[in-house]
Design a protein with these regions (language model features):
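Fungal secretory targeting signals
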Residues: 1-19
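Exposed, interaction-prone regions of secreted/extracellular proteins
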Residues: 15-274
């Protein structure tokens, strides 16, 4: 799911620390985790910002939440890194993302499935025969783009089993419509309440804490940024709040190149009280 925001809609306070707490908070019903804006990137130009993003995703234990947004037959979250997920509405760009879709059922069965997606195309699942993933596994995910964001590649490596899946493709395009390059205005490290192909939105499981290790994003000259090392105008921290239940479901932290996204169920009257 692509996340479109305007700076004026952001909530939060800033401080001098470079741990992500200096970023404005942005509340929605889908994303949890940090967004890092590329330095000196101009959205109206054809310049390229980040051309690589990576992190190692640690597969958390999943359980049925005590107070979910609603009760369902399957609780799911997508756990991913991306390029170009935060855009203004007048720019034709496509989110290039890869990671793991995590699900748990009431009988305790769990499933961890690798995926990649270039929005607006549908996600492509990675079968377990190509990349088996289990609780506790460390999945190193790398996204790259070339040709000014019109071509991309990804690798997902299970560091516990040494199995690697690779994929490359051109940018998504609509039939007789525009092409959606990922020119790297932003990089993201996110746990998301995404949507199934029938457009029904996921309901989060309880994942405790989902960790991204060795997270960074780099431009084509090799200059790299960490998720939380920007100033207050170079990033934002997203969090999931549902107004109908008056509940905040996530809280995120950054320490160096490590991102931690915690599942919580905190009742509060509004996001102003977060």
């Amino acid at each position: 799911m692509i996340f479109k925001v305007l700076a004026a809609s952001l909530f939060g306070m800033t401080c001098a620390a470079k741990d992500g707490s200096q970023y404005p908070l942005s509340y929605g019903e889908a994303w949890a985790g940090p967004v890092r804006f590329a330095d000196n990137f101009n959205l109206s130009s054809n310049s390229t910002g980040f051309t690589m993003a990576e992190a190692t995703l640690v597969m958390p234990h999943l359980s049925i939440p005590k107070k979910p947004h609603k009760e369902v037959d399957e609780y799911t979250a997508s756990f991913w890194i991306g390029l170009d997920g935060v855009l203004s509405s007048d720019i034709v760009r496509g989110l290039w993302q890869a990671g793991v879709i995590m699900s748990v059922w009431p009988n305790g069965t769990t499933q961890y499935t690798g995926f990649h997606e270039w929005i607006p195309d549908d996600p492509i699942d990675v079968s377990s025969s190509k990349l088996a993933i289990s609780e506790g596994d460390h999945i190193h995910v790398v996204l790259k783009t070339t040709n000014n964001g019109y071509h991309g590649s990804t690798t997902l490596t299970n560091l516990n089993t040494s199995r690697t899946y690779t994929h490359s493709q051109n940018a998504a395009n609509l039939w007789r419509g525009p092409t959606f390059p990922a020119q790297g205005a932003t990089a993201e490290w996110i746990v998301e309440a995404g949507t199934y192909l029938n457009t029904t939105q996921y309901v989060f499981p309880n994942w405790g804490t989902a960790s991204f290790l060795n997270a960074r994003a780099c431009n084509e000259k090799g200059k790299c940024s960490l998720p939380g090392d920007g100033n207050k105008k170079q990033g934002e921290m997203t969090a999931v709040f549902w107004n109908d239940t008056k509940t905040l479901y996530t809280k995120s932290y950054i320490t160096g190149d490590r991102v931690s996204v915690e599942y919580i169920e905190k009742h509060q009257p509004s996001v102003a009280n977060a």
